[in-house]
Regions:
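Generic structural signal for hydrophobic
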Residues: 67-68, 131, 171, 231, ...
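Hydrophobic faces of well-ordered beta-strands that scaffold small-molecule active sites
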Residues: 51-55, 75-78, 104-109, 139-141, ...
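Bacterial N-terminal signal peptides that target proteins for export
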Residues: 1-12
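H/E-rich (His + Asp/Glu) clusters that bind or coordinate divalent metals
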Residues: 216, 220-230, 235, 239-370
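C-terminal motif of bacterial Sec signal peptides marking the signal peptidase cleavage site
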Residues: 20-21
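An N-terminally biased module of ancient metal coordination in phosphate/nucleic-acid-related enzymes
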Residues: 24-103, 122-123
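Acidic-and-aromatic substrate-binding clefts and catalytic sites of carbohydrate-active enzymes
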Residues: 54-62, 80-89, 113-122, 149, ...
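Active-site gating/metal-coordination segments in enzymes
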Residues: 38-43, 91-219, 266, 273
Length: 370
């Protein structure tokens, strides 16, 4: 009995230390005193060990991983409740993590089969438990919760629904990270010609079912964010990474409010760096200072990946070019352009210490076992 109690106390103490370390903002004086030697250059790209914590590798092919090796990246491949059956995604992930154990980790997910019945919770916990035993270091929760799932009465089911609490509690007790893609970028609720990013215009044109501007009956953008925030309030010790800048990509001030409120929350940058860049056009200093202040809560990621029918050479060139552009934005102060919008902007030239956190140490901190 004493041993169990001590273990619980130790676990509680460790959780407290983790949350305290997340809540503490960077010391601004330290950053201001950085010397020129403490900055990386564009030429350092391949020299620095890095993580891309959000990719989707759904083909038993090594070329995507080979490209990561050339770019000096380790990867986290994400299973998601969309497309291929989740069991097949896990099978591929296990093959590849065995082959490339020093280069690749994987995140599992769960499906919604039998939702609303007595079978759903036990089957979900059983699948997650098996995934953790096979090496999964995170659980992906996808936007179909909040955007597609309805109960038997036709009511929308959001992530703060009490029926998810048992699952979230199990994940927390297992010391596993939740990666949550909940909601969509705010552009999804705008007309296409009002969207700020070309990539969003293209995506929502190709996937009109997620273009919420066309579906006024669906939950609002604010509903999505509120449900996610409610879930975090109910689970203050759940280690949570909000995918895609936590669907708050449009305004660093709004994202800062959540990072202040929820010390157990970080965000990945997958497919949302152009949203930071477009904000840099109007207020470079605000974006720069935001990243400095929340340098312990930001994790680099791209959201690239491969499918069995992918043109691997094209995908590898695209992800390499994106990584090079992102690196230039973060480490230099050069004038830049990107395909997502026409305006020019300046790189952020972040100190080495900050770059190392975004690309390396934060991945290890928020995804233990990566």
């Amino acid at each position: 009995m004493k041993i169990c109690l001590n273990t619980k106390i130790a676990g509680w103490y460790a959780a407290c230390i983790f949350l305290q370390s997340c809540a503490a903002p960077a010391d601004k004086k330290t950053i201001e005193n950085i010397t020129p030697a403490a900055y990386y250059s564009a030429a350092d790209f391949t020299k620095v060990k890095k993580y891309d914590t959000h990719v989707h590798i759904n083909a038993d092919d090594s070329t995507f991983i080979d490209q990561a090796k050339k770019d000096n990246f380790r990867l986290l491949t994400i299973n998601v409740n969309s497309g291929h059956p989740i069991e097949e995604q896990r099978r591929i992930a296990l093959i590849l993590t065995k082959k490339f154990h020093d280069r690749l980790a994987f995140a599992t997910t769960f499906n919604l089969d039998n939702w609303g019945t007595e079978k759903w919770q036990p089957q979900t916990i059983a699948y997650l438990k098996e995934s953790f035993e096979k090496g999964a270091i995170a659980v992906k929760i996808w936007k179909n919760i909040g955007m597609e799932l309805k109960d038997a009465n036709g009511k929308w089911v959001m992530i703060d629904d009490a029926r998810f609490d048992t699952i979230l509690n199990f994940i927390e007790k297992s010391n596993i990270t939740v990666l949550g893609h909940l909601g969509e970028p705010r552009n999804a609720w705008l007309a296409t010609d009002s969207m700020t990013i070309a990539g969003d215009k293209r995506y929502f044109t190709e996937h009109p079912q997620y273009h919420q501007f066309l579906h006024k009956e669906n939950p609002s953008y604010e509903d999505q964010i509120r449900a996610r925030d409610n879930m975090l309030s109910k689970h203050p010790h759940l280690r949570f990474v909000g995918a895609h800048l936590g669907s708050l990509e449009w305004n660093v001030d709004e994202l800062a409010k959540r990072l202040d409120k929820f010390p157990n929350m970080a965000v990945d940058m997958a497919a949302r760096i152009p949203h930071l860049q477009v904000q840099s056009v109007k207020n470079w200093q605000k974006v720069h200072d935001f990243i400095i202040k929340y340098q312990d809560r930001l994790v680099y990621a791209t959201d690239h990946g491969v499918e069995p029918k992918s043109n691997f050479a094209e995908v590898n060139k695209e992800v390499h070019d994106v990584r090079i552009s992102d690196w230039k934005y973060f480490v230099t102060d050069e004038e830049m352009t990107v395909p997502d919008f026409s305006e020019k902007f300046k790189g952020l030239k972040l100190p080495k210490e900050v770059i190392d956190k975004i690309y390396l140490t934060n991945a290890k901190k928020w995804f233990p076992g990566i």
